[in-house]
Amino acid sequence: MRSRLWLGLAWLLLARAPGAPGGYPHLEGDVRWRRLFSSTHFFLRVDLGGRVQGTRWRHGQDSIVEIRSVRVGTVVIKAVYSGFYVAMNRRGRLYGSRVYSVDCRFRERIEENGYNTYASRRWRHRGRPMFLALDSQGIPRQGRRTRRHQLSTHFLPVLVSS
């Protein structure tokens, strides 16, 4: 009798009515075209060779990225011009990937100062998240040397103007 009660309770908690939305569907599948402007004054770009770096040129086609929400708080960043996904390997190095993989997923968080940070969903270094970051010369910083409070990890998603 007791096991049937628990089974019924579990079914009530886990089951959804047919057609009922699950989670936050308005936040999933959202697609935004933006330029990611770093607080170090560089736009994130992915060139035709798949190299991730920063550029100061605000009108470059290779700095337009598509930020797609795949889950609540999880995004995929894809360069529109080159078609490469921004990805991070286990050593914390940023690279452009032709195909989508779990290395391409980032946790997007809006910080208190209004900037966004992007931490790898897959990789951590000694229990700490590894962040997307551009240093003061526009060179990607190794993820294991980054922290949330560092300015090099802060990005503003800027609207793409015609």
From Swiss-Prot:
The keyword Secreted applies. It holds the Pfam family FGF. PROSITE patterns: HBGF_FGF. GO terms for biological process: regulation of synapse maturation; trans-synaptic signaling. It comes from the Eukaryota. Residues 1-22 form the signal peptide. Preferentially expressed in skin; low expression in brain. Expressed in the inner root sheath of the hair follicle. One of its GO terms (molecular function) is growth factor activity. GO terms for cellular component: cell surface; extrinsic component of postsynaptic density membrane; GABA-ergic synapse; glutamatergic synapse; Golgi apparatus; nucleolus; postsynapse. Keywords: Growth factor, Secreted, Signal. It is found in: Secreted. Belongs to the heparin-binding growth factors family. Interacts with FGFR1 and FGFR2. Interacts with FGFBP1. Plays a role in the fasting response, glucose homeostasis, lipolysis and lipogenesis. Can stimulate cell proliferation (in vitro). May be involved in hair development. This is Fibroblast growth factor 22. It comes from Mus musculus (Mouse). The lineage of its organism: Eukaryota, Metazoa, Chordata, Craniata, Vertebrata.
